[in-house]
Amino acid sequence: MTEFSPREIVSELDRFIVGHPEAKRAVAVALRNRWRRRRVPDDLRDEVTPKNILMIGPTGVGKTEIARRLAKLAQAPFLKVEATKFTEVGYVGRDVDQIVRDLVESAIQMVREKRRAAVRARAEAAAEERILDALTGPGSTAAREAFRRKLRAGELDDKEVELQLADTSSPFGAMDIPGQPGASMGVLNLGDMFGKAFGGRTKTHKTTVSGAWVPLIAEESDKLVDQEALTQEALELAENQGIVFLDEIDKVASRQDRAGADVSREGVQRDLLPLIEGTTVSTKHGPVKTDHILFIASGAFHVAKPSDLLPELQGRLPIRVELKALSRQDMRRILTEPEANLIRQHQALLATEGVTLTFTEDAIDALADAAVAVNGSVENIGARRLQTILEKVLEEVSFTAADRDGETITVDAAYVNGRIGDLAGNADLSKFIL
């Protein structure tokens, strides 16, 4: 779990996301509260529940990006899911309990990587012995040492070897649950049960020495790691530090002015209630309590309003954060300020062809103006409009870059307006092209 202070979390998010200080502060405090809860006396720890967050803001302002960056910062099991993927229990589709199962898988992967790293040195030594066995056979000490020196020097990387690796696949293949796409694992994963019954099987793999290291180190690491303790730690991690980001929550809100059966929409909300409030979900690794999992819900709420959500669900998302629509100045900053901004990405892509791409200040102004103009006249899709416009402006350059090695291309306002000036001004054309 990360030990950043709220101020450090906000400054870290500022490196990648422009604006929205309130949303950044809310997620920073929520993340820090996870750290604080672990230091609270035992008798109070179970009583401290996370304050779930509802982010409200138009599309393309950075709600999902905040979640993505938070996932990297959190160093905790993190899952981002779209609420629209789920249906009410009893209908064809995935039910919301799958969220917790996926979170547990994420936690297991995290703990496995951490434990593998702890035994990596021993696993590498064992993997080296197995590669030498494949190259020289189990005996021949003198030849083995000569091969060991060559192996460590990298002289044998291209040599082909035959390895016996554990076959973890089930002899019966994947078993999907009918009517639930992707739900091949549940409380009883038959594939796993039968796979273990036929355990101890190996499979012959032909590969180069350099390609053999990764599977061998993984296999040797897993032999050194206590799998039961790993699962137990992962379940505890998911229960106490898990974070779930529920995107597109507005799409399962039923509008009050709409008549008709919205069964599966409202049903998803009703199914989410116990999950967010706190319940126990059965997974193939064991039961998981959701009382202390932090839920961050977000939605554009273009058509529905937050008040269209079930009152009980609104009550379970006590912290409300509103993200404002992006201004022209925000658009300009998005093009230049974030570490992996769009302009830098395009410059790096074209640099691989030997083309140097530069943008003047007035070109950046023209791009921001065009994005704001099209968002205002057609449909406001926020910062995503910049991608569309930039692709259109650089279309010709990207196409001919392979023939322009060594050239420097300067993009100025005249260049930008020459490519998209007429389109941005014509609402009918913008609808189809920008």
From Swiss-Prot:
Single Gene Ontology BP annotation: protein unfolding
Keywords noted in UniProt: ATP-binding, Chaperone, Cytoplasm, Nucleotide-binding, Stress response
GO annotations of cellular component type: HslUV protease complex
Keyword Nucleotide-binding on entry: yes
Binding-site positions, ATP: 18, 60-65, 247, 312, 384
InterPro entries, A to Z: AAA+_ATPase (IPR003593), ATP-dep_Clp_protease_ClpX (IPR050052), ATPase_AAA_core (IPR003959), Clp_ATPase_C (IPR019489), HslU (IPR004491), P-loop_NTPase (IPR027417)
Disulfide bonds: none
NCBIfam families: hslU, PRK05201.1
Subunit structure, interactors included: A double ring-shaped homohexamer of HslV is capped on each side by a ring-shaped HslU homohexamer. The assembly of the HslU/HslV complex is dependent on binding of ATP.
Protein's recorded name: ATP-dependent protease ATPase subunit HslU
Source organism of this protein record: Phenylobacterium zucineum (strain HLK1)
Lineage: Bacteria, Pseudomonadati, Pseudomonadota, Alphaproteobacteria, Caulobacterales
